Amino acid sequence: MTDASFLDTGVALGYCFRDDTHHYRCREYLEENGFSLYISDHVEDEYLNREPDLAEEIADGIRDHIFQLQNSDYEGQLDSMDTSQIRQNLVGNNNASTSLHDFYRNQVTNFIQLEELIKRLRELSRDIEQNAIENRQWLLARTEIWSRKNDYSEIDEALSEIPWDDRRICLDAHDVVEQRGEITELATVNPRDLVDEGYRELILGQTALEDVVSLAVRS
């Protein structure tokens, strides 16, 4: 049985942003398993660098939806049929589609004025980054930031066909096993470079990791 999981950047982003394609699988994995969690210091840095831009992209998706509403034929009081049509015709597959569908499903009453709807949508756009920050704080409270000292040059060479950013995470996760003695798996949303084409078997053959687990939602 696995004692610990080492997370790549995509898993952290997937958990913290519910509009991320992999959010629900990442959330289930992190909240329903009781093992120790680790991320590397460079994963933390990469996450913090990307968080504001991703939040802005999602907020822009909500603002685009507001613009569509303002330029539509809807006006005055909307009923449940109107809001159902809005969900079907105006939400689309933009960067905020998950948040928007959840908003219409759970926060919009059967009757609502268009102005009130737009007001609430603006509030939703402002909350995107704060929600991600709160999720990140929850995650970091459960996670140990790991700094590797050993370069493991022989393993690094054996994994050389794997891109460096992914290879580095493999070495970081291997270091946890070496230093802590915990049965550890690597969790990723990037199966192309860490699971597919024999990469999983290569990693398990060259490192002390128990498994490489893909949380990716594939199309």
Which stretches of residues belong to each language-model region?
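Short, well-structured N-terminal submotif of metal-dependent ribonuclease cores
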Residues: 1-39, 46-82, 95
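Long hydrophobic alpha-helices with heptad-repeat/coiled-coil character
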Residues: 52, 64, 89-102, 200-219
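Active-site neighborhoods of divalent-metal-dependent phosphate/nucleic-acid chemistry enzymes
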Residues: 86-185, 189
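Repeat-unit-sized solenoid/scaffold elements
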Residues: 76-85, 131, 209-219
